[in-house]
Amino acid sequence: MGHQEIDIRRVIPAPPRAVFASLLDRSTWPAWSGHDAFELVRPGAAGPYDVGSVGLLRSGRRVMREEIVEVVADRRISYRLLAGLPLRGYRAEFDLAPTTEGTKVRWHSSFDAPPGLGWLYVAALRRFTGRLLDGLAERLRDRATTTT
């Protein structure tokens, strides 16, 4: 297995609190992320989307089972993939930082891919996550214009 890392950055025109809330509440993801559905399998210790929370994200026939492993309010959400892709040790973080334009989001993931397929998973995850972040930016931009 070959070790892979992906790093994607976007500036989202919304405050960190709004970006964080949308990323943490995975029940909203089908509206903007490119996923078809979300199902909460197990709530976290301190709330439905806190550390220990396990959920299923469906995209077509693919179902990914993910667990939230770290939450730092308005700053970071980390999760690990439990099932759904043939990757080992998959872990990803959304890191948030305020900017004058809104929130800088950094999505970083690392994993071990099957031999010869690392490039394919890097390309697919980079494309999918880029669209996810673009969808989030559009959702929050639309929300801001309807509330002002």
Residue ranges and their predicted role:
Residues 31, 40-84, 135-148:
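Glycine-rich portal/gate segments that line the openings of hydrophobic small-molecule binding cavities
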Residues 60, 86, 113-117:
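Short, cysteine-centered beta-strand-loop-beta hairpins and adjacent loop/turn segments enriched
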Residues 93-119:
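A mid-sequence interfacial segment
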